[in-house]
Amino acid sequence: MRIRPIAAAAAVTLLAGLGTAVTTTSSQAVPGAAATTAAKAAKYEVTATVSRTEPEQGEKITIRGTVAPGEKGAEVVLQKRYGTTGKWTKADTDTLNGKGKFKFSEKVDSVRFRQYRVLKPADDKAKSGKSKKLGVTVFGWRALTSLDPVAVTATSEVGSVGINGNTYEQSIVATPVNSGSIAYNVTRGCKSFQGHAGLKDTSPLTATGDIKILTDTTQAYANSFGVTQSAPVSLDLTGVFRITVEWTSHNTAGTEEDQSGALVALGTPRVLCSF
């Protein structure tokens, strides 16, 4: 009969021990652990756009966007690199406004391809985040004669030439023969061509000259000039690999074999390129 009280006491002791164990395990939980884990897993989302992807040298571009979650006064960093494999460097900083927005402006001063991205550094609220890369190709005007010609026939590059009473620097002029040409590769890296066509002022009044400009194999321009005549030339070079200038002289004072005299000239020819 005494065995029952002993067994009952043992059962009470065992239950008490289990209760203690359960209580002890529950008390080891850290308040806010789930919230901390969630915060560490969060990442800033940065979106950005650029105002122009093909600006001209010296122009200003604007990069703007948002950060989520965004807090007013939080700092964001504009990073830049040249090419696609260069090192990212800090270009500027800005602080978010009350709507989580930022804005950067930069004057592009060199003719080369570059990439931008915007970085939101990490803090106790979220991991760092960055925008997608924004590619910008800067174009600049350069003299056509700054390129090496790939083919030349009876044509010269000169420091200056007089056409219809005006002087043009870095120009192209025919030599006193019947015809000639000069060609340059622009390797699909240029968008526009500008120049001024006519005859060199020392050409005889009896001469007239024809000029043609080819973009690859397409005739993009053609005209004829006498002395005191000239005209501006503007061409689209998008996708063009080679530009060729061809000319022919005609002279009423010449012979059937010799029609030289018209010194066809292209004043200050220049191209808008990304190189």
Map each language-model feature to its residues.
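Gly-Asp-aromatic-enriched flexible segments
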Residues: K132-F275
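Low-complexity, Ser/Thr/Pro-rich intrinsically disordered linker/stalk segments at domain junctions
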Residues: R2-G140
